[in-house]
């Protein structure tokens, strides 16, 4: 049974067919098309449809198509007699399994951040299809989740936590914390980042993560952005554009349709400011609540710029500690379109 055609899952299919020529390969229509496309295998295939069932003696296999979680052919296979679901990449996690495979053999909390990192990097773009898949599976009684990445979840509390985490992530819900991601060439933009962070901490934000995009892995930055509701991005002007690492991060967030965030942005320049324009355009394209005017430093730190940075930290802290919901900022062009 092929739940997912990505080569990290199907790389052994050709070998299996060579060793067992009469083997039957079970998949849905898109799977069988890809099987032929990737490996030239078209014989001995068994086509199944959404909600279909296949008897294998004492047990049955039930198939649930979950397209775009995170490829178009993805599906899950459920064994009702055992109440076990083979979920493909869904509910997956990064991280090695060092000895134990079952959640009873490991420390489950070790994999929570790795599950968020996996979701944000691999599945993060597909929040709506994940929600559709969760609704489709909501009526199943599940004793074990067997993902293709990470531990096998068998403890009822762990199963509930895993499903709840995917539900929250796919709704872009997040914890009350702050991510500050920035690029800096000479230290000026970094100084602004540190001022904002210290002021947010003074005003009650206890979960603050700072990422220098030149030093942090983007994989880790994406994890934290999906984890926390507050996001502030800073960049110097670089050849009339954003700092390359910041530009890459902004592109990655836009590609994942991130929403439901309190957002601020800041930057620095020497003679021509384009940071505000580029980050402002990014903010306008996302469903963020922009908390203050951008903080922009020309050449060096002045007292008024420092105070604006502190104000950004204070306002973000108030948003995160007050329990307020995100209200997406309406821009003039959007307001005109809404009236139409």
Task: Give a label for each model feature.
Residues 40-105:
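Catalytic core of the metallo-beta-lactamase
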Residues 144-175:
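Terminal amphipathic helices with adjacent charged low-complexity linkers/tails
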Residues 1-5, 25-28, 85-88, 145-149:
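Active-site neighborhood of phospho(di)ester-bond hydrolases with catalytic His/Asp-centered motifs
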Residues 12, 216-221:
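Short acidic active-site motifs
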Residues 59, 83-86, 144, 177, ...:
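Structural motif
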Residues 181-202:
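Short, charged N-terminal beta->alpha structural module
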Residues 1-25:
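Active-site metal-binding motif and surrounding structural segment of the metallo-beta-lactamase
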Residues 97, 101, 107-146, 150-152, ...:
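FMN-binding flavodoxin-like domain, especially the glycine-rich phosphate-binding loop
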